[in-house]
A protein has these predicted regions:
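Rossmann-like adenosine-cofactor binding region
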Residues: 147-212
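Walker A (P-loop) phosphate-binding loop of P-loop NTPases
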Residues: 261
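Phosphate/diphosphate ligand-binding glycine-rich loop within oxidoreductases
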Residues: 2-104, 196-198, 204, 208, ...
Length: 261
């Protein structure tokens, strides 16, 4: 079985490590430029593939079938080659994000949610929150005339905040996309960044005693779902949590080993 990850810059990826815990199959990284995508997808070089930025929308026209979730969100992160050689596209980020909210105990039903950023991950977050019955879901973006970072204070009554922007990861370590202190009734903060494991936004949440979660659980949960699609086998519902804990321990060991003294 030949699986792997398709993207443009993949040196930082934890995906091969995660998939090594999910099955005995190859999972190489495929770094491709935009002009190489068509030839890569149409060649018979893989049985299944995960897709990351910037190609989650690019691959859609090459799919002969799309899951309902992929159609609803408008992006594909999991591709499987069907017996007739054509490609099926799904979006397991939806499952991963939903799993992350559930495990963190973030119940968005009838609550107000703001989502920072308007990229592909933002679409997934919005879709899941609406499906879970959120009362209001507002996307905050720099280019929006109505809901942007300059007037974000009008949403200071938000119950949950979800960051889907890269602010907080390299080279923006130590930066937060918002001032969390204005959100007096915030019940939870989710940051889809997982490296560093605690962004400035999450450190601020910790300081304010607001429950918070990073994106590692989502990453592991979507990988478990993708592996189920690839291999046609079901994993235990706690598999993603077990893998998340294992990776967290490894990341902690790396930090400790790198400390001076």
């Amino acid at each position: 079985m030949r699986f792997g990850l398709l993207g443009r810059k993949l040196g930082h990826s934890y995906s091969p490590q995660i998939h090594s815990l999910l099955g005995d199959y190859e999972y190489p990284l495929y770094e491709k430029e935009p002009e190489e995508i068509e030839a890569f997808l149409t060649a018979d070089g893989f049985d299944g593939m995960n897709v990351t930025i910037p190609y989650k929308e690019t691959v859609m026209p090459y799919m002969s079938q799309l899951s309902e979730t992929a159609q609803k969100i408008g992006s594909v992160n999991t591709v499987k080659r069907l017996p007739d050689g054509t490609l099926y596209g799904d979006n397991t980020d939806y499952y991963g994000f939903s799993y992350m909210l559930d495990r963190a105990g973030f119940d968005v039903k009838n609550k107000k949610v703001i989502v920072l950023g308007n990229g592909g991950a933002s679409k997934t977050a919005v879709c899941v929150c609406r499906d879970k019955g959120a009362k209001e879901v507002t996307v905050i973006s720099r280019r929006s005339e109505t809901d942007n970072y300059q007037n974000i204070s009008k949403h200071s009554n938000a119950d949950y905040i979800i960051n889907t922007t890269p602010v907080g990861m390299y080279p923006n370590n130590g930066e937060s996309p918002i001032d969390l202190t204005i959100f007096k009734q915030c019940k939870g903060v989710a940051d889809l960044i997982y490296n560093p494991s605690k962004t400035q936004l999450l450190l601020d949440a910790e300081k304010l005693s607001i429950p918070h979660v990073n994106g590692l659980t989502m990453l592991c949960a979507q990988a478990v779902k993708a592996a189920e699609i690839f291999t046609n086998q079901k994993f235990d519902s706690n598999k993603a949590t077990a893998i998340t804990k294992k990776l967290e321990q490894q990341m902690l060991n790396i930090v400790l080993l790198g400390m001076p003294g």
